Regions:
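N-terminal leader segment of winged-helix/HTH proteins
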Residues: 1-32
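N-terminal helix-turn-helix DNA-binding core of bacterial DNA-binding proteins
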Residues: 21-62, 67-69, 73-75, 82-83
Length: 84
């Protein structure tokens, strides 16, 4: 598979993921903070809670609560940070 073909498939996949996240965000009646965190993760990729909090301009404790709520809804799945 060439780079152009791979890039095309990646664009299609990301578009589908973006659409699904928007649909789920609406269906789940998420808070503004939850929607913002999901959209940032979609755009920027995986991040630690601390990094995400800094990017969103909130305290890590607040982002931890936001991420915890999203995990409990099944919209996020956390994994251990290898640098931790």
């Amino acid at each position: 598979m060439g780079n152009a073909e791979l890039a095309g498939e990646l664009r299609v996949t990301l578009s589908k993921l973006s659409r699904r996240l928007r649909e789920q965000a609406h269906a789940a009646d998420l808070t503004g903070a939850q929607k913002s965190a999901l959209l940032r993760l979609e755009r920027d990729g995986p991040a630690t809670v601390t990094t995400l909090a800094r990017a969103e301009g909130v305290r890590p404790q607040s982002m931890g609560a936001t991420v915890g709520a999203l995990e409990s809804m099944g919209l996020l799945a956390g994994s251990p940070d290898p640098a931790d």
